[in-house]
Swiss-Prot record:
It is a peripheral membrane protein. One of its GO terms (biological process) is aerobic respiration. One of its GO terms (cellular component) is plasma membrane. One of its GO terms (molecular function) is iron ion binding. Binds 2 [4Fe-4S] clusters per subunit. The keyword Cell inner membrane applies. Belongs to the complex I 23 kDa subunit family. It is an enzyme of class 7 (translocase). Its main location: membrane. Gene3D superfamilies: 3.30.70.3270. It comes from Pseudomonas aeruginosa (strain ATCC 15692 / DSM 22644 / CIP 104116 / JCM 14847 / LMG 12228 / 1C / PRS 101 / PAO1). This is NADH-quinone oxidoreductase subunit I.
């Protein structure tokens, strides 16, 4: 008889514990979001879609140095270098295959001109895999991105048309080495 009472008390306690657990989970913050209706929280350093930025003058920042393609562990970046009349390099074509990209950010770190930047955009779903291959015109944005005042050619020391050598930002005047001789 005592064993039956213990079984009834144990069964009742188990049922009450289950009810408390259910009510506790009912009022807890939900893990599942109704995605299109509710915006998804993204951390501040989230790495999403890759874009190509422009310098403050409105020109392409990319100098087609090919460092991003070399740094990419899956080889999803391909580009071809071309040169303007004034000696400035630019990519003739720039292609990223987002179906292979793992969004690691190594291309952004390797870029010396900060032309490649990763944005928090993640909605890139397509029905055909070929639509995930983005060309240069798909990747170029109109603004400078994260570094609005940085201009690679002014810092790098390349001669700017109409300006003498040494007139660029962070560039020293040319030194006459013959005047240093005794």
């Amino acid at each position: 008889m005592i064993k039956e009472i213990i079984n009834v008390v144990h069964g009742t306690f188990t049922q009450l514990r289950s009810l408390v657990m259910i009510f506790g989970h009912a009022f807890r913050k939900r893990d599942t979001l109704q995605y299109p209706e509710e915006p998804v929280y993204l951390p501040p350093r989230y790495r999403g879609r890759i874009v190509l930025t422009r310098d403050p003058d409105g020109e392409e920042r990319c100098v087609a140095c090919n460092l991003c393609a070399v740094a990419c562990p899956v080889g999803c970046i391909s580009l071809q270098k071309a040169e303007t009349e004034d000696g400035r390099w630019y990519p003739e074509f720039f292609r990223i295959n987002f179906s292979r990209c793992i969004f690691c950010g190594l291309c952004e770190e390797a870029c010396p001109t900060t032309a490649i930047q990763l944005t928090p955009d993640f909605e890139m779903g397509e029905f055909k895999r070929q639509d995930l291959v983005y060309e240069k015109h798909d990747l170029l944005i109109s603004g400078p991105g994260k570094n609005p005042d940085y201009n690679y050619y002014r810092v790098a020391g390349m001669a700017i048309a109409g300006k003498p050598k040494g007139a660029a930002q962070n560039e020293a005047e040319p030194i006459n080495v013959k005047s240093l001789l005794p």
